[in-house]
Amino acid sequence: MPVDEVVKEEAIEDCKNVMNQMKVIYQKADKGTSSNIVVSETVMEEMQEVLKEKNVPVITSAPYSNMANYSKMEEFLFRAEQDLTGDIVLYRINRDGGIERLKFNYDGTDMFHYCLRNYYIR
């Protein structure tokens, strides 16, 4: 499905801003010596706290991770059940310290999902 250029640019700019907010945490984190970077659950939780303060839904890829600001996602899904249009962005912090921006859009009939994944280059 083609993505509108405005939506695409908005997602890219949003991800750049989020990655810049996480940069200091990522740079200080112990990433090990392997070529496959893995940050600790503590680092992922620290990154989650930064986004939590922005009042957006955010989850980490750690097992049994809780979604911060889950009520925002619940509200969006409840409205979709009522056939009310809307959208929401969920962020997922991955083991490599990268961030996924998952945008869900409900148009009253269909649900669309746009995903953009960012990661740091060593």
Region annotations inferred by a language model:
Residues M1-R122:
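Mature, Sec-exported extracytoplasmic domains of Gram-positive
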